[in-house]
Amino acid sequence: MSSAIEALFEERRRFPPSPEFASQANATGELYEQAERDYAAFWAGWARKLEWSKPFTETLEWNEPFARWFGDGELNVAVNCLDRHVRCGKGEKIAYYFEGEPGDRRTLTYRELLEDVNRFANGLRKLGIGKGDRVAIYMPMIPELPVAMLACARIGAAHSVIFGGFSPESIVDRVNDASCVALITADFGWRRGNKVPLKRNCDIAMEQTPTIAHCIVARRVGDDVFMHETRDIWWSELVAGESTECEPEAMNAEALLFLLYTSGTTAKPKGIKHTAAGYLTQAAMTHELVFDLKAAHDIYWCTADIGWVTGHSYIVYGPLANGASSVLYEGTPDFPDKDRFWEIVERYGVTILYTAPTAIRTFMKWGTEYPAKHDLSSLRLLGTVGEPINPEAWIWYREWIGANTTPVVDTWWQTETGGIMIAPLPGVTTLLPGSATRPLPGIGVDIVNDRGESVPLGGGGYVVLTHPWPGMLRGIWGDDERYVQTYWSKVPHRYFAGDGARRDADGNYWFMGRIDDVMNVSGHRISTTEIESALVDHPRVAEAAACGKLDEMTGQAVYAFVSLKGGLGGTPEFADELRDHVASKLGKFTRPKYVTFTQELPKTRSGKIMRRLLRDIAEGRTLGDTTTLADSSIVHELAERAKAEVAQEE
């Protein structure tokens, strides 16, 4: 860490809640006051909304940096997501509207989901899998994925979901780190009309995973795959004849619910540990309040992949704990055409939509004719997740998807936090385009400088969390020392989030991206997010990414990669126009030295811009691992263009 990050961009537009929305909102301003008085008691109140087989009497045990929440209580997560809803007469309520990429559709009621989970849980027990085991899951976005997760939770096994876009090597790393005893997969998945060979990837991986005794395979596509005689079993055969009842395992509140690995592109992946009760409490509370969920009639859709934490918390555990009806979509936003998302919103009458800024910027680039084809009037609340959203994308989202009326909740959180940490409470919070606004009730946040001192309002710096929260990670699997070093060693007694932000005069948080997405230009520390927001503010720019390039004169120079609306190419004259535009918005020292135009920015399959690769391209370095890219051909083309751009400027 060096000096605090300079905050340059000021957004003045404000959207207070409408009286109509506020009058029916789940949240009230009193929640902040309750949490301020006693945050542990506040969280205990939310935990008591869950069903406990043994109620807790101890709320928080804090031995920094290790927390135990509700530690003497017992519950079962699957019971809280399924059984209790069926018991109270909601068994016929739809849990999931499933839409496959090829257009096949299924609905699953809470009763059907419970029966499927119980059959599969019984099948797992028959294989000898049970309490304390770890089970890897590598599946497409089909209903069998949440079924597998909940079946593990029912019998007390911890799941480790591996994103279906990862390579066999990534499967090996994750399976071996946790000594998983079983691997659950599918024959294939669908992606843009192509068959993704999931089972084949698992076969390659299992040559190097000695702890895997069983591989369970769901049929998604139906094509032939290799089946090992003693190891592999079809899902359908495993559950055939199994009972639709399964006794749930009573689990301690602090029992491991799942592992989720953060990306291992530069180091060994970190197995983030989340435990049953605290995680479920925060997932359910945040889902109810941040999305203003009315479970009786809302149709909720989080477009993430379950392979990422957003899918765990806001497709599976939060919505099911709250008895919500959700859309589960297998495919991409542009297959078979660029209006697929809006077709789905219209078909199911989606009322709450939660997606990523990258997707929104892509929709902007494609143009408004695609959402305009469909009736989106069912939507009443929009959310964003995954990275900071620039104000223009926020405004576009509200205007073209939300009919200029819906609240837009920009949410900040991490794999490590388990649930949303900073976000508006719709009906309470005045919304600011580009700001996640305030920490949620019960969450302690501060911004500090490089000496660990709190930065006054109006200043920028490093985001830290000031006290424990229920959904927090309980460590890194098998590596307590790495947990302490990564998150607790940089600022005394504070969780170091690794993100930069500024806090305005009203206490609202404006995120500026990861700290490694900060440039030092002539002694000024500038967030790449602010540069990108200024670029996207230009009416012809659809998407932009910025990074620093080493520079003899200024330490670092700003390098901008720009994608234009309508897929148009850029000219040297327009590059100069963009340089002037950024300088006028943020100051002359922020003027990009290099501007490279591209049809597409390199992104992971989850839609995040691969900034590490852009830094490599800018510096002319050998490109690192590209296996997580959605389209690796983009990178090599971009590297050639960048080489020419640098040669021209120098």
Residue ranges and their predicted role:
Residues 162-187, 202, 334, 346, ...:
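AMP-binding/adenylate-forming catalytic core of the ANL superfamily
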Residues 317, 321-324, 351-355, 364-431, ...:
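Gly/Ser/Thr-rich phosphate-binding loop
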Residues 122, 150, 154-237, 349, ...:
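Structural core segment of the AMP-binding/adenylate-forming
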Residues 92-94, 215-217, 228-261, 268, ...:
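Conserved pre-ATP/AMP-binding loop-to-beta segment of ANL
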Residues 438-442, 453-487, 526, 622-623:
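Conserved ATP/PPi-binding loop(s) of AMP-dependent carboxylate-activating enzymes
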Residues 33, 78-79, 96-150, 167-172, ...:
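Conserved AMP-binding/adenylate-forming core of the ANL superfamily
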Residues 280-299, 309-352, 365-366:
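Conserved AMP-binding/adenylation subdomain of ANL enzymes
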Residues 139, 160-176, 188-198, 278, ...:
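ATP-dependent adenylate-forming carboxylate-activation enzymes
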